Every structure is written in C-alpha cells, then in structure tokens.
Amino acid sequence: ADYGYNISMGDHCFCNYGCVLLDVCPIRIGDMTQIGPYVQILTADHPRDAATRDQGREFGQPVEIGRNVWIGGGAILLPGVTVGDDAVIGAGAVVTKPVAAGMTVAGNPARPLVPRASSH
C-alpha cells in the first residue's frame, strides 16, 4: 500500500503478493473478497486537459469493492470505479466503469461476459 490509512478491508479477505493499492482516496473492500497477484487498485487521477495538467493539478476518486468479489491476477481498477457484490474481474482486465453485482467482466477495457449464478 502506498499510504495505507485509506484502505478498509472486510473480514476474511485475501490479497495475494505484488498488489498495489494506491489510496490517495478511500479504497473499501468487502468481506470475503479475493484479490489475485499483481492487482492494482488506483485512486490517484489527473486532469485529461493538457493545460490543466501542466499546472500540476491532481485529484483522486475512491474505489469501492463489494463482498465476495474475485479479482484475477494483474487486473487494474481505475479511480472512481465500483464493483458490486459477487462480481468477478478477469485476470488482466482494466476496469474503467462500474461493475454490477454478480457480473463477470474481462478485457481491456473490461466488458461484461455473463452474470454469475447466485449461491445464496
């Protein structure tokens, strides 16, 4: 973790080796979530406009991950995304938009594949 004090992990979570949690804003991870190796969860961002970026401005957006989420190795979650409960993020996916509960996403940018069957 870069800072560490903005990270909140639920009960029975697992975070594999080599992960980066850049927490300039809050990162919230729900219970029973599993995070594969080399996953990056990023909250630091910068303006897209070159003139504003030249002024040195930066900002952050929080990332929220629900409960019982599985994040495959090497996935990248960009600032401001939310991931719903029981979702699956495929290995190497780049998550740029919200992921609905129960959804499986993969690719760059991450796109929906199929909803997972509920185990409840």
Predicted regions and their residues:
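Flexible, glycine/small-residue-enriched loop-and-beta-strand segment within the central core
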Residues: A1-T82, M103, N108-H120
